Amino acid sequence: MAAPGAPAEYGYIRTVLGQQILGQLDSSSLALPSEAKLKLAGSSGRGGQTVKSLRIQEQVQQTLARKGRSSVGNGNLHRTSSVPEYVYNLHLVENDFVGGRSPVPKTYDMLKAGTTATYEGRWGRGTAQYSSQKSVEERSLRHPLRRLEISPDSSPERAHYTHSDYQYSQRSQAGHTLHHQESRRAALLVPPRYARSEIVGVSRAGTTSRQRHFDTYHRQYQHGSVSDTVFDSIPANPALLTYPRPGTSRSMGNLLEKENYLTAGLTVGQVRPLVPLQPVTQNRASRSSWHQSSFHSTRTLREAGPSVAVDSSGRRAHLTVGQAAAGGSGNLLTERSTFTDSQLGNADMEMTLERAVSMLEADHMLPSRISAAATFIQHECFQKSEARKRVNQLRGILKLLQLLKVQNEDVQRAVCGALRNLVFEDNDNKLEVAELNGVPRLLQVLKQTRDLETKKQITDHTVNLRSRNGWPGAVAHACNPSTLGGQGGRITRSGVRDQPDQHGLLWNLSSNDKLKNLMITEALLTLTENIIIPFSGWPEGDYPKANGLLDFDIFYNVTGCLRNMSSAGADGRKAMRRCDGLIDSLVHYVRGTIADYQPDDKATENCVCILHNLSYQLEAELPEKYSQNIYIQNRNIQTDNNKSIGCFGSRSRKVKEQYQDVPMPEEKSNPKGVEWLWHSIVIRMYLSLIAKSVRNYTQEASLGALQNLTAGSGPMPTSVAQTVVQKESGLQHTRKMLHVGDPSVKKTAISLLRNLSRNLSLQNEIAKETLPDLVSIIPDTVPSTDLLIETTASACYTLNNIIQNSYQNARDLLNTGGIQKIMAISAGDAYASNKASKAASVLLYSLWAHTELHHAYKKAQFKKTDFVNSRTAKAYHSLKD
């Protein structure tokens, strides 16, 4: 099976594999010399057998050298370089690296004997010193054959490292030369092929045990310019870097917190702590700590010594003091000897809350130790209300707040994470933070730190999980509705409690009703000046302005905090309206998202909810300088002979007509601050969001803001109503909201129509656009749920407004078949009085007032007693609408 070689290789026999398999190869095997060459050697005075013997020795040396450099471990299967790559691709040789499972090809660049060899691949680039005196033929010139070898099972003397897709690189320590076996051990890379992998660990007894891992992401730590992934088994060389180094600006523990923060089955609203899960050998010289981004470990190496961890179900393992100090904070130590015995105490003692709180002493502990203790507290308070209470009893909150002054990013980040879990759903801890002057301390850190992770710890949860985990919008909390006397508007105020996946430290504090006014007093100005105004781009006109110190998540988190604060009450609303730049920035940001065709932006939802709350009772709470201008004509209205007009006094129809005849105050072309709240630009902005956004809470807040602005009968509500209906054609958008699936949006839309229908000049237009829709949403029977009762009552009052002064509108209501529904609901008032039944009774009484329709009623088989009876008369005369 010999094949003639190329001229440069004349005299050598080609491989015994046939051409049908290998084709035209460009390299030769290390076969024996040809007979012709042996004859030539014999004629030159050298014995052929001697040449043959030397050639065999040379062949064996080169084969062993190439085998040592090129083999790659894959479990128990090793691949040598005796078979060309494409032979594997022909599936003639079965191997784990064939086909789609093959990793990125590695390139080898070997210089002369004793020089450094570099290797690179998907996992990074590394160097090693080789003592081989033979150079490797470059792959571009030769394709050496490959052989398959089956190696024995893994043993404690030979550890395999499993790596994630993150970069892997390793450098030998100064003065160390990696020979063949050491370099092979350092280069054993197993590419992750499954989400679940079994990692071979070494127990104290020398036996192997397996640990199941449910996450392919592994933590990565920085050391100089080299990025090493964390080892999943004991390192082959204990002298190599194992521990974190202090002073690193950011740890992968915090970066990967973003990847694993929101996982299925977790209690919402908390920070996933950064806690090491690792087996630990009793040999301190070889003890290592490696961190994993997942806490889903089903089994630890019990033989390896005590450790502590908590998986997703809350089950405890053990964490030693030494482990917490080595890796709990996520910031690495270059030397284990950094800790003295007096500092560590017994490193194998189990870490407890008591011990962790006692370690929070800035004057006596290294920053890395403090970070480890704070991280442990953060971890223990995750899903454990008892741990939160215990830390409070140990005065741990005070110690954590005092540590905020430490000028160390890692300490500040760990402390903020611990505080964030401590205040989650624990009002006592929230009040404790406030009483200990914690809010100003947090704001000081927020202003001074340049670390984005710390800012996010203070304002909200981790960053990027929103897209990965379907980040839900902030849930609006509808407070008990308050009715403004004589205004006909039922206004709800939006707020956000401790929400799933939205639970920053300040956000959680602002969810406590007792702390909202405190937050407004201490945090409003700082958050507005340092976050809201810079990011929104106002007043420069840019949108938005993310930079190295701010990003969208921080802006979103702060708007969520302000959203809670805006529901504090009258004093809080007034303070927020007076805050320079707040309303301007919010309006500027929302207008920018609409212009960029992003009406579903989740920060826009928060901004609109804030504006919605600030428009609540606006007419009554306006500063005197605005009310004097708006109501100047209102006070000049006089009635003839000072007599009260109508049975309802100042709320009668004739007085409303006089209000509507009063000229409206001129609108400022350049509004500022609170003036934006009723400006036509903002009204148009709300209508755009109603029409374009698909987020229910954005729609509800926009409708609610217009509802608040149109509540009442003064110049401002009348002007806003006319703008909505006549100038901006807003009825078409409001009408569509009557048919959405969300009942809260539907209820708010009907409440807005009810306010609009109080304007006499708009009633016919409203009836023309919406009367059939109003009838369609009225149920056939008495509603049972509170929300449906409110919706039905508002629909009946709206119909009552538009039929009172119009015979034609009343006839249209009769023709649509709505009277039968109304009578059925009114009848329910006899046995279960509610708002809907009362509103239906009022509407029936008003319908009978149109005498010209009596014949039509009788023709439709209705009697007078269906419209006028003791029930309907009582409801009508008790009406204070």
Swiss-Prot record:
Per UniProt, what does mutating C796R do? In ARVD9; impairs protein stability
> What keywords were assigned to this record?
Cardiomyopathy, Cell adhesion, Cell junction, Cytoplasm, Disease variant, Methylation, Nucleus, Phosphoprotein, Repeat
Q: One of this protein's GO BP terms?
A: ventricular cardiac muscle cell action potential
| Impact noted for substituting G673V | In ARVD9; uncertain significance
Q: Which positions bear Phosphoserine?
A: S44, S82, S132, S135, S151, S154, S155, S169, S172, S183, S197, S251, S294, S329
Q: Name one GO molecular function term.
A: transmembrane transporter binding
**What does the UniProt induction comment state?**
(Microbial infection) mRNA levels increase in response to P.gingivalis challenge while protein expression decreases, suggesting proteasomal degradation in response to P.gingivalis infection of gingival epithelial cells.
- Tell me the segments the record calls region Disordered: 282-314
List modified residues, type Omega-N-methylarginine: R46
Residue ranges of the ARM repeats are 341-383, 385-424, 427-467, 571-616, 671-711, 719-758, 763-804, 807-849
Question: What are the start and end residues of every segment in region (Required for interaction with influenza A virus RNA polymerase subunit PB1)?
Answer: 1-348
Known function: A component of desmosome cell-cell junctions which are required for positive regulation of cellular adhesion. Regulates focal adhesion turnover resulting in changes in focal adhesion size, cell adhesion and cell spreading, potentially via transcriptional modulation of beta-integrins. Required to maintain gingival epithelial barrier function. Important component of the desmosome that is also required for localization of desmosome component proteins such as DSC2, DSG2 and JUP to the desmosome cell-cell junction.
- Record note on quaternary structure: Interacts with DSC2. Interacts with JUP. Interacts with KRT5/CK5, KRT8/CK8, KRT14/CK14, KRT18/CK18 and VIM. Interacts (via N-terminus) with MARK3/C-TAK1. Interacts with DSP. Interacts with DSG1, DSG2 and DSG3. Interacts (via N-terminus) with CTNNB1. Interacts with CDH1. Interacts with the RNA polymerase III (Pol III) complex proteins POLR3A/RPC155, POLR3F/RPC39 and POLR3C/RPC82. Interacts with CTNNA3. Interacts (via N-terminus) with SCN5A/Nav1.5. Interacts with ANK3/ANKG and GJA1/CX43. (Microbial infection) Interacts (via N-terminus) with influenza A virus RNA polymerase subunit PB1 (via C-terminus); the interaction competitively inhibits the interaction between the subunits PB1 and PB2.
Q: What is this protein called?
A: Plakophilin-2
Organism field: Homo sapiens (Human)
